[in-house]
Amino acid sequence: MRFTTVAFSLIVFIVIFSIFVANLASLIGIDKQLSNRLDAAVSDGQTREHERLRLDDSPNHLMWFLQISDIHISMYLDPARVPQLVEFCNRTVDIIAPSVVLASGDLTDAKTSNFLGSKQHEQEWRWYHEVLRDTNVLNKTVWLDIRGNHDNFNVPALQTRQDLFTNFSVQGRRHTRSYMQQIVKGGERYTFIAVDASLDPGPKRPFNFVGMLSLNETQHLINLAERSRQLDTNYTIWFGHYPTSCILTPGLGTGGIRNLIGRYREVYAYLSGHFHTLGGAVPRMYTLQDEGFLELELGDWMRHRRYRLGAFDHGHFSFVDVHHNQWPVVLVTNPKDALFQIPGKESFEAMMHSSHIRLLVFSPAKITECQVKLDAGSWRDCKRVSRELFVVPWEPAQYKRGLHKLFVYVLDDDGRSRMIEQQFTLDGTRLRFDFLAKLVLMYDTNKVFQTFFSVALIVYLVPLCVFRIWHTLVRSEYDRRGTVVKPRLRTFCCGSWIRKMWILSTVDRLMLPIVGYCLYLTCGPWSIAYALPASSNYHLCQ
């Protein structure tokens, strides 16, 4: 009786204390200097106002780019990844002609031959380097790559012999970690800020699933954002391998990196990879963060051969995720998809006063048909304004209330067709993102893991302790002929489960090790191993 009461109390104490410590650490972990700089960024941002541009049939004020993520070039798996990456760099980049290509991490696989361990293979990095060199893609566009957790496996320190990203990537030779790239097109400045949240040093698999920004790296990112403002940037995209929910940021408090990104009004979106759409369970892993920017996780190239086309059109950001070799590629930029409206940064008034529906169309063959239809209206032919821009006049005043549907049909000279449907609104009607997508992207991963662990611990141990206490009371009351009785199994719908739990709770040789093991998991190291290569010391990992 005494043991079970103590054990039960200890379980409750550990769970409550761990939650308290986690939240307390977030509250007291706010660096005052960082906080002051972010407050200054907000004040400065309130004085900046974008010029309101009219959405007509002009090809100006338009820029588009591509994103590819989680390539996982491997010595042991799926040899088609490399030749299809060659095809992407040759054919897709040539057809779409993006201003920028973002390669957001996990460029190589870095696994051992048994797929259990991790190792940086120089051959995988050579293949990546040779693809970019042989396809001449670096002379066609700006290629911005960043580390992923696989690119950082078994790396004892950055810029060492084991840090192959530095030697074989495009940006690794120029930038130690996070960096900024600004391009100018049509007189407008577009800035891309790369976030390197990889661990330093980089441990072996599987100990670097979550990224972290040190205080110095956070200061560096703020410096990049401030420099971007000084260069009078119009629109900014942040990108990295880890989603924001997977990045620890000591010094930024509970808001984390989202608090940093959201302080800059010119930031429209954060683009990432890493989660692989949870194995296809969340194929549309998108959300609008409370801080006022879109967060968009991209499905992987590794298995699904996905890439993203993003565009800024007259101050409005749109995107579409595409399967490799899926042609034609169609992206409607006006009216914008209602789900991805960014309040405070994109103007419904601009769409309301626009004169044309606008869409980008790309295909290896000549486009022979491009038509649009609004709601139950008739199909209307689009006019080609430039190589990729198609427009058609419309009357937005007819659609100023509620949600409406836009249909697009495109046919090319080789007989390939694409039919898309999207909803739009001109009055601010909001659509809801998928619940799982919001859960994964808006909540801190470490807190989600802590919650799941705490719930599992309670579900696993509390019934055992309750039945143990109940059994002890029954036995003591039986000796005194008391009123505490055993459960009547016929009155319970889970009689078989109760019987098994009751018996288990009475066998000390089973009950005590189970409770002890579970309590150990809350405070003891889970493994003792070499977390870093060529290390002379063991590391305790929990």
Where are these regions (language model features)?
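Extended active-site neighborhood of metal-dependent phosphoesterases/phosphodiesterases
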Residues: 28-56, 113-230, 253-269, 275-322
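Acidic, histidine-bearing metal-coordination/catalytic regions of metal-dependent phosphoesterases
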Residues: 1-100, 133-142, 327-542
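Active-site micro-motifs of SAM-dependent methyltransferase domains
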Residues: 73, 109, 151-152, 244, ...
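Short acidic, glycine-rich surface-loop motifs adjacent to enzyme active sites
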Residues: 104, 225-247
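Structural motif
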Residues: 64, 100, 190-192, 235-237, ...
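Short N-terminal helix/helix-N-cap motif within the alpha/beta-hydrolase-1
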Residues: 73-76, 112-113, 155, 247
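Post-signal peptide N-terminal segment of secreted/secretory-pathway proteins
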Residues: 104, 110-113
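Active-site glycine-centered loops adjacent to acidic/histidine catalytic or metal-binding residues
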Residues: 70, 105-106, 148-149, 241, ...
